[in-house]
Amino acid sequence: MKPDFEKGDGLLTTVVTDADTKDVLMVAWMNAESYQRTLASGQTWFWSRSRQELWHKGATSGNLQDVVSMTLDCDQDTLLVAVHPHGPACHTGHTSCFFNPVELEQGA
């Protein structure tokens, strides 16, 4: 099965998890080139929407992500990537980019 890059204007939403803990580490985007580089290198590559450039995760910080598995969703437009991280996924130094709780309104 191949990803469908047409649905998301050339980008796949990519959910990255820790292969051992199953924790969600981050959400990023892949285009066709970053997808191919990820397959070829065994490490995560993404497309930076803000910088409009390819991004080898951890190349600067040393917090690389070794790919263990990649799974497409049923619509082939979202990718789940399980990794062995070499450090925190978040640029803030947190293990995961998801560390800001949202308070729910009571009775909502």
UniProtKB/Swiss-Prot annotation:
The keyword Cytoplasm applies. The keyword Calcium does not apply. Its cofactor is Mg(2+); Zn(2+). Mg(2+) binds at residues 73, 75, 77. It is found in: Cytoplasm. Binds 1 Mg(2+) ion per subunit. It catalyses: 1-(5-phospho-beta-D-ribosyl)-5'-AMP + H2O = 1-(5-phospho-beta-D-ribosyl)-5-[(5-phospho-beta-D-ribosylamino)methylideneamino]imidazole-4-carboxamide. Keywords: Amino-acid biosynthesis, Cytoplasm, Histidine biosynthesis, Hydrolase, Magnesium, Metal-binding, Zinc. GO terms for biological process: L-histidine biosynthetic process. InterPro entries: PRA-CH, PRib_AMP_CycHydrolase_dom, PRib_AMP_CycHydrolase_sf. Signal peptide: none annotated. Pfam families: PRA-CH. Its EC number is 3.5.4.19. Catalyzes the hydrolysis of the adenine ring of phosphoribosyl-AMP. Belongs to the PRA-CH family. This is Phosphoribosyl-AMP cyclohydrolase. It comes from Lactiplantibacillus plantarum (strain ATCC BAA-793 / NCIMB 8826 / WCFS1) (Lactobacillus plantarum).
